[in-house]
Amino acid sequence: MINVTLSPSVTVGNEAPFTLFGGINVLESRDLALRAAEEYVRVTQKLGIPYVFKGSFDKANRSSIHSYRGPGLEEGMKILQAVKDTFGVPVITDVHEPWQAAPVAEVADVVQLPAFLARQTDLVEALAKTGRAVNIKKPQFMSPAQIQNVVEKFVEAGNEQLILCDRGTCLGYDNLVVDMLGFGVMKKVSGNRPVIFDVTHSLQQRESGAAASGGRRAQVAELARAGMAVGLAGLFLEAHPNPAEAKCDGPSALPLAQLEPFLAQVKAIDDLVKSFAPLQID
């Protein structure tokens, strides 16, 4: 078992109690980030869930040139630092270009490799050299077994603080499904490194030719329960006070007001599954 320790209170591992990587999709404003973080911290502390705040400073892969991308690197780091200073929690954000890695790592406790960029060697090496823990998003077009090649790149570049994340797999055009058997494959080929599940991005669904993703928010609880029943290191989640007004991926976002009952169910599943004795079936 390989664990990744992010703080004295947050250790990410497949056999450890699950860690929540939760926040908002894109950093819309300082006030919204702090409002969301406050609710996440309240609920996770009440339920005893290790917690990392998530927010993107730039959504560089938006489908439309007219879509909101975020506040940018400088302002985004100020917002993430404000969350850290106010609530004392680790933070995670995604990096899209090699030159961004070093300044992001000055603030972020976890740097994220976006799914669409997971095979970009220059970016992998730049993230590895930060010395920070890295969350590797498995591309929608990549089989679970192929994640081994991405892991090998990071290890060769000198960084073994790796977390692997599944965010769904393409099923034909404009649709994603979650392969529940894939989680175990990712654990196996990586030497049992922590594997987490991005439930909200897995709910994306797009109408052909649409400029923005739709989503299946109503099914977020059932998909999260199913994923956590496998036995995972963590859950990756995005919520919003008013998903209809979110500037990115609102149709997949959990309403922030439902965070506590949602996480109570997820934690109950995680606690139950990890109370079982290991069962080896050859």
From Swiss-Prot:
The keyword Repeat does not apply. It catalyses: D-arabinose 5-phosphate + phosphoenolpyruvate + H2O = 3-deoxy-alpha-D-manno-2-octulosonate-8-phosphate + phosphate. The keyword Cytoplasm applies. Keywords: Cytoplasm, Lipopolysaccharide biosynthesis, Transferase. GO terms for cellular component: cytoplasm. SUPFAM superfamilies: Aldolase. One of its GO terms (biological process) is keto-3-deoxy-D-manno-octulosonic acid biosynthetic process. It is an enzyme of class 2 (transferase). Pfam families: DAHP_synth_1. Its main location: cytoplasm. Pathway: Carbohydrate biosynthesis; 3-deoxy-D-manno-octulosonate biosynthesis; 3-deoxy-D-manno-octulosonate from D-ribulose 5-phosphate: step 2/3; Bacterial outer membrane biogenesis; lipopolysaccharide biosynthesis. It is found in: Cytoplasm. One of its GO terms (molecular function) is 3-deoxy-8-phosphooctulonate synthase activity. Its EC number is 2.5.1.55. Belongs to the KdsA family. PANTHER family: PHOSPHO-2-DEHYDRO-3-DEOXYHEPTONATE ALDOLASE. This is 2-dehydro-3-deoxyphosphooctonate aldolase. It comes from Chromobacterium violaceum (strain ATCC 12472 / DSM 30191 / JCM 1249 / CCUG 213 / NBRC 12614 / NCIMB 9131 / NCTC 9757 / MK).
